[in-house]
């Protein structure tokens, strides 16, 4: 089955795995998805991720993070810019998610980065998703 929006598919797989309390989730690999996984790990939303090389395609295996009482650290994921409606933002308008408790992920001319990193580097870009 072909996927029209691979990033939305990644976010949906993570959301479903969190709701089902799975330890890991497998996602078909791409450079953009790897960059998003690196940001999620750096910001503390996931425990770890590995890339498994495969014959038809490689996959990213994400180890999800839970609190001591087995509640998922990721409580919400939202795709913002979609293939049918791209959303771009200037540096001054980079959104704060949940009053600073969440994270916005942007695709900028300097690569994929978190919203606060883009603000520090004084660049805007396409708002890929929100995580909280």
UniProtKB/Swiss-Prot annotation:
Can you name a GO cellular component term?
ribosome
Per the record, the domain of life is: Bacteria
Q: Name one GO molecular function term.
A: structural constituent of ribosome
GO-annotated biological processes: translation
Ribonucleoprotein keyword on record: yes
**Keywords associated with the record:** Ribonucleoprotein, Ribosomal protein, RNA-binding, rRNA-binding
Q: What does this protein do?
A: One of the primary rRNA binding proteins, it binds directly to 16S rRNA central domain where it helps coordinate assembly of the platform of the 30S subunit.
Return the similarity comment.
Belongs to the universal ribosomal protein uS8 family.
Stored NCBIfam families: PRK00136.1
Assembly notes? Part of the 30S ribosomal subunit. Contacts proteins S5 and S12.
Record's protein name: Small ribosomal subunit protein uS8
What is the protein's species of origin? Roseiflexus castenholzii (strain DSM 13941 / HLO8)
